[in-house]
C-alpha cells in the first residue's frame, strides 16, 4: 500500500491526532489487494512503471511531468499500455513524459473559470472533497497551497493519483479513499474546502453543506460547484428517475435556492461566480475514456435536453465564507 506517514504527521501537526489514528487503522484495509478484484492488476501495472526522473515539472499553468526526452530507451508504447491499465481516465488532462493523457473532462477549463474568483491559495490548507484522481489538487499546489488533502471513495481514482505521485513525489498532496461522511465532524482546520460535482449526488444536500462547513476554520472559504436549473428561490428539481443516464442525482437547485441553502447553513459572503453549460468539447469520450460520455447523455435532436427530456447540464460555481 501507499505510505501515508507524511499525511499522518501533518494531521497531527494540525491538531488532528484522532483522525490520524483513525486513518492509520482503516486505510490499510481499504487499500489491500483484496479490497477489489481489480486491485491486483492495478498494483501490477504500478510496480511495472519505469523509474524516470522528470527533468521538468509544471503545476501552475497545467500538469506536466517530465518530457519525452526523459524516457531515453524506455518504450513509449509499453508505457502507454501501463497507463491504460488504469482506464478510464476521467479528470485531467496530464502531459506525462510527452504522453498526452486526454481525459474525459477538460478539468483545466473548470479550474480557469474558478481561479480568478477564489481567495488566493498561497499558504493555505485545502480539502478537496470528491477529488477524483487529484488533478485539481495538483493545480492547487501549483497555485501555492501549502497542503492539499483529496478524498474520494473510488479506488481507481486513488491509483491514478499514485501514478502521478510516483514521479512528482509531493509530500504535501495526498488522496485517500474515503467519503466526506467518514471525515470526523467539526474539524475546523482547513482554510479552503472544495466540493465540485458532489452535491447533486447527495440524498441530503443540506447535511453535505454542514459537513463541508465543519471542515472549515472560522473565516475559511467554501468553493462549491454543482448542477443548477433556471428558476426562482423556490425552484428545486428532483429527477423522477435517471438524469443524463445517472441514477444517483437527487436535488438540483436554482441559483437562488442554492444561495438560500448556504445562508441557512450559516455561510456568509455568498456569491455565484460562474455558470457554464457543459459542452461536448469539455466532456467527451477519448482514447483514455472509452465509455459513453456527454454526447450519449443528451437528446440527439436537442442539445438543451438530456436523453430523458430534462434540462441539459448547467453548472454553477459558488463561493462562501464560514462565519
UniProtKB/Swiss-Prot annotation:
Pfam families found in the cross-reference section: Methyltransf_9
Positions annotated to bind carboxy-S-adenosyl-L-methionine: 91, 105, 110, 130, 180-181, 196, 200, 315
Top-level taxon: Bacteria
This protein's UniProt keywords: Transferase, tRNA processing
Enzyme nomenclature, EC number: 2.5.1.-
tRNA processing as UniProt keyword: yes
Catalyses which reaction(s): carboxy-S-adenosyl-L-methionine + 5-hydroxyuridine(34) in tRNA = 5-carboxymethoxyuridine(34) in tRNA + S-adenosyl-L-homocysteine + H(+)
GO biological process, one term: tRNA wobble uridine modification
Class in the EC hierarchy, top level: transferase
Gene Ontology MF annotations: methyltransferase activity; transferase activity, transferring alkyl or aryl (other than methyl) groups
Coiled coil: none
Function: Catalyzes carboxymethyl transfer from carboxy-S-adenosyl-L-methionine (Cx-SAM) to 5-hydroxyuridine (ho5U) to form 5-carboxymethoxyuridine (cmo5U) at position 34 in tRNAs.
Oligomeric form and interacting partners: Homotetramer.
Alphabetical list of PANTHER family matching this protein: METHYLTRANSFERASE, TRNA U34 CARBOXYMETHYLTRANSFERASE
Family: Belongs to the class I-like SAM-binding methyltransferase superfamily. CmoB family.
Protein name, entry field: tRNA U34 carboxymethyltransferase
Naturally occurring in which organism (per UniProt): Geobacter sp. (strain M21)
